[in-house]
């Protein structure tokens, strides 16, 4: 159903909006947003932080969900899952209104230093579970690290972390059926005919790489939770055709 045909929207009584404006605007408006506007929350590292560059997957998801879900993005360049978990209590997340959570970490965890992995694989798995635990009512997509065509800072060994991401999804689905999905970005990028075109520097995605990731996210949602596709979500505020002559 096109946007112009959509009659399924979130409507608000004029009296309710009037009360919000007249009684303590800041406090009431925040309450109003939390009550009505559901969200897509994304947590990741630099690949997510750069996700608003032209063609970036965060920008594409924000466009995809215009006036259907608010998109909250928390990308932390250079962070491992350990670092994100450390600062999780300080991130102003809207947990109750998050319909879909995407966690894309592991690219920094799997770096091999002189003393071992930057974040050991068992800890990585536990961190993923801890990061998703505050979202018991959200659908969750775990994105595994992809390949790298060049070593940046350190050599990376992704395969154990892909397995850990898969095991995390299995654990989440045992707790609550069909609550989580996996995007195996390692296999997807590895099997791409010309993988070097997916990256700007061998690690961070080009617009082509981001497009590949965006399409995988949409495919995962379509298969597992079609009710979360934009056309199946209410429009936030009436369509212009409903109010043009009012």
UniProtKB/Swiss-Prot annotation:
Keywords, in A-Z order: Cytoplasm, Hydrolase
Site, Transition state stabilizer: residue positions: 78, 108
Enzyme active site: 46 (nucleophile), 201 (proton donor), 204 (proton acceptor)
GO biological process, one term: acetate metabolic process
Gene3D superfamilies given in the database record: SGNH hydrolase
Cellular location(s): Cytoplasm
Keyword ATP-binding: no
Name of the protein: Isoamyl acetate-hydrolyzing esterase
């Amino acid at each position: 159903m096109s946007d112009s045909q959509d009659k399924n929207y979130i409507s608000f009584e004029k009296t309710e909006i009037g009360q919000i404006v007249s009684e303590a605007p800041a406090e009431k408006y925040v309450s109003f947003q939390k009550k009505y506007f559901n969200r897509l929350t994304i947590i990741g590292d630099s690949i997510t932080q750069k996700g608003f560059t032209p063609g970036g997957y965060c920008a594409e998801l924000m466009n995809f969900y215009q006036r259907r879900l608010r998109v909250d993005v928390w990308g932390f360049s250079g962070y491992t899952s350990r670092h994100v978990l450390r600062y999780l209590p300080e991130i102003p997340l809207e947990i109750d209104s998050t319909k879909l959570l995407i966690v894309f970490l592991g690219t920094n965890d799997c770096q091999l230093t002189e003393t071992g992995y930057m974040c050991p694989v068992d800890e990585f798995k536990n961190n993923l579970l801890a990061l998703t635990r505050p979202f018991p009512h959200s659908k969750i997509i775990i994105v595994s690290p992809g390949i790298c065509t060049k070593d940046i800072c350190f050599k990376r060994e992704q395969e154990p972390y892909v397995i850990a991401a898969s095991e995390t999804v299995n654990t989440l689905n045992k707790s609550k059926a069909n609550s989580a999905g996996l995007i195996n970005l390692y296999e997807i990028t590895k099997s791409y005919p010309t993988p070097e075109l997916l990256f700007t520097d061998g690690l961070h995605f080009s617009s082509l790489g981001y497009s590949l990731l965006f399409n995988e996210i949409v495919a995962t949602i379509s298969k597992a939770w079609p009710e979360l596709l934009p056309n199946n979500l209410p429009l936030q505020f009436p369509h212009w055709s409903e109010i043009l002559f009012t």
